[in-house]
Amino acid sequence: MELPIAPIGRIIKDAGAERVSDDARITLAKILEEMGRDIASEAIKLARHAGRKTIKAEDIELAVRRFKK
């Protein structure tokens, strides 16, 4: 796991939780990492399709929209 756990706990608390277990933080971190990899992979495909090597914010945004469907 690469994402730090403390910020994950803050995200959950910002959503309204009073307390957050370590298991919950670790589980959300794993899920977010997997989602991040999937979104990045789709963004890479979009950039390559556009003839670019550089991933732009718009590639990420479009990739996220595709996953929301």
Swiss-Prot record:
Changing R10S: Loss of formation of nucleosome-like structures with DNA. One of its GO terms (cellular component) is chromosome. Transmembrane segments: none annotated. Induction: Expression is relatively low during exponential growth, and is higher during the stationary phase. Its main location: cytoplasm. One of its GO terms (biological process) is protein homooligomerization. Disulfide bonds: none annotated. Keywords: Chromosome, Cytoplasm, DNA-binding. Changing K13 to E/Q/T: Loss of formation of nucleosome-like structures with DNA. The record marks K13 as: Interaction with DNA. NCBIfam families: archaea_histone (NF043032). Binds and compacts DNA (95 to 150 base pairs) to form nucleosome-like structures that contain positive DNA supercoils. Increases the resistance of DNA to thermal denaturation in vitro. This is DNA-binding protein HMf-2.
